[in-house]
Amino acid sequence: MVIANKNIIFVAGLGGIGFDTSREIVKSGPKNLVILDRIENPAAIAELKALNPKVIVTFYPYDVTVPVAETTKLLKIIFDKLKTVDLLINGAGILDDYQIERTIAVNFTGTVNTTTAIMSFWDKRKGGPGGVIANICSVTGFNAIYQVPVYSASKAAALSFTNSLAKLAPITGVTAYSINPGITKTTLVHKFNSWLDVEPRVAELLLEHPTQTTLQCAQNFVKAIEANQNGAIWKLDLGRLEAIEWTKHWDSHI
C-alpha cells in the first residue's frame, strides 16, 4: 500500500510505538490521519500537523472497551466526513497483569470490537469496498513472557484473531496482517506488574536484554504497511522486520 493520499484510522496513535509510527506515517503523506485515543494530547497532534502540513490530522477521544454500538457511531462520523477509509490500525494495549479484566478488554476484546464495528462500513457482503487492518500484537503471541501470562495470552488471542481475519478476506473483502514488536523501549516496559507478583523484577530483567527504539519499530511498521501482505505475521524485533512462517499443527478442513 502506498501511504500517500490514503485515509488512515489509527487507534492508540499517540502511545509509545504509536506516536513514532504516526510521525512516520505523516512523513509518507496520507490524505488523512485520524487518531483515536483515550487521552487527548494537543501538543502531539500539533507536532504531527507541523511535520507535514498537507496531511489532515484529526483526533477523536476513544476507549476501546466501549460496546461495539458506540464504536460504530464514532466510525459513522468519521466515514461521513472522509467517505472512504483505506487502513485501520488497532494499536491499543496495556501491560499490567494485576489488571486481568482490563488487560483482556483492551488488548483483545477492544481489537475484536473495533474490527467488528468497521465491518459495517467495509464488508463487501454489505456493499462495502473492503479495507485493510493492521493489528498491533506482540512477539509474546509467539512465545509467552511467562511471568505476565495474562498479557501474553491476550496478545496470542489478538494474533489468532488477525490470522483468521486474513483467511476471511475472500468473503469480507477486508485483508489483515499482524505487527508483532519485540521488547521496545517505551514507558510500557519500564515498570509493570507480573501476575500474582511471581517476578517483581520482570521489567528490570527484560531490559537487561537487547531492545529496540520506538523509532526503529515505527520505521519497520511503515515498511509492513507498504508491503500490505494479507495474512503476514510481521516480527519487528531488534530493529529488523521479518515475516514469520506460522507452524500448522492442526487443520479444521473446512
UniProtKB/Swiss-Prot annotation:
Keywords of the record: NAD, Oxidoreductase
UniProt record, GO biological process: alcohol metabolic process
Matching Gene3D superfamilies: NAD(P)-binding Rossmann-like Domain (3.40.50.720)
Record-linked CDD domains: ADH_SDR_c_like (cd05323)
Chain residues that bind substrate: S138
Catalysed reaction, written as an equation: a primary alcohol + NAD(+) = an aldehyde + NADH + H(+); a secondary alcohol + NAD(+) = a ketone + NADH + H(+)
Positions contributing to NAD(+) binding: 10-33
UniProt xrefs under Pfam families: adh_short
Record-level Gene Ontology MF annotations: alcohol dehydrogenase (NAD+) activity
GO cellular component, one term: cytoplasm
Enzyme class: oxidoreductase
Active site: Y151 (proton acceptor)
Entry's EC annotation: 1.1.1.1
Subunit: Homodimer.
The family this protein is said to belong to: Belongs to the short-chain dehydrogenases/reductases (SDR) family.
Name this protein carries in UniProt: Alcohol dehydrogenase
Species name: Drosophila mayaguana
Gene that produces this protein: Adh
